[in-house]
Curated annotation (Swiss-Prot):
Function: Can catalyze the hydrolysis of ATP in the presence of single-stranded DNA, the ATP-dependent uptake of single-stranded DNA by duplex DNA, and the ATP-dependent hybridization of homologous single-stranded DNAs. It interacts with LexA causing its activation and leading to its autocatalytic cleavage.
Keyword Calcium found: no
Protein name: Protein RecA
InterPro entries on file: AAA+_ATPase, DNA_recomb/repair_RecA, DNA_recomb/repair_RecA_CS, P-loop_NTPase, RecA-like_C, RecA-like_N, RecA_ATP-bd, RecA_C_sf
Organism whose genome encodes this protein: Desulfovibrio desulfuricans (strain ATCC 27774 / DSM 6949 / MB)
Keyword Transport (UniProt): no
Keywords: ATP-binding, Cytoplasm, DNA damage, DNA recombination, DNA repair, DNA-binding, Nucleotide-binding, SOS response
GO MF terms, alphabetically ordered: ATP binding; ATP hydrolysis activity; ATP-dependent DNA damage sensor activity; damaged DNA binding; single-stranded DNA binding
PROSITE patterns reported for this sequence: RECA_1 (PS00321), RECA_2 (PS50162), RECA_3 (PS50163)
Amino acid sequence: MARKPALSPEEARAEALGTALATIERKYGKGAVMKLSDDAHVNIPVIPTGSIGLDLALGVGGIPRGRISEIFGPESSGKTTLTLHIIAECQRLGGTCAFVDAEHALDVSYARRLGVNTDELLISQPDYGEQALDIADMLVRSGAVDLVVVDSVAALIPQAELEGDMGETQVGGHARLMSHAMRRLTGTIHKSRTSVIFINQIRMKIGVTGYGSPETTTGGNALKFYSSVRLDIRRIQTLKDKEESFGSRTRVKVVKNKVAPPFRSAVFDILYGLGISRAGELLDLGIEAKIIDQSGSWFAFGAEKLGQGREKVRALLDENIDLRNQIEAKVVEFLGLHPREFTPTAEDIAESQDPVLED
């Protein structure tokens, strides 16, 4: 009987690896270990945000599925508004959404005006943090929910703190709660393709002066570490008609992105009671891309005069859907090649990096 030719070191390594992979696959199922090229996320499944500029800034067209995302910012900056738009977009695509309202503050009528089908929206108003995160975990494990929103991390009070005496401190309890929840949720979320969004608030660090940002988010470092996308949303201007304010100009910075390049931004208007102004955003992006010409207070799209005054043109685009779609197609084509980026500060770079987790 002829002897098998001796294998070269490279062939022996390849055979050993193949045997190990086959054993792992038999024991833990197909896909337990694979080469990155076997499952390359060229087209990452996403949920649109309701903002054209933000979808483009995220690099993949929206919030990635099967990942954890964090939306944080100061009070009244538009965090919940943006999240409700994401819910509306998910429902429009036929998805099932759940809203874990730890703050007990969801405005149902406002959600309807933003396009959310509240009759189909699953809502939970938990009593304490562990209950909220357990409900979120069970919804994800069901595999039947496309989007779970937790509003907000700051309201996820540990049960021990809730049942303790007023003034009694539970040092690190909130951070431990979030760390434990993230470890449980991450693997389940990836397998289920559910997108989980945590809304978070900003707090001021105690005793920080000089170098470094005095701001931080609540809940410790675990959420920063496990989030694939982190969005910093800020109100940068109040929109006024004479003396009466009717909305706010808002900037969203992508300070962390594991699915596309970070440090991109989007600017849009949030109109009180109406949410993100898609027509207003298209007008701004069209001017930036030189698709819409502005001469003084007059606006034109090619040879077509759109009108005089920004608000009148915005109203026109709200009514004329065909015209809006034409402008949108050109804007998306331009910004897909020329994304709006910002120069990151030291704080932005720190936010984009995974923090060191402590047990």
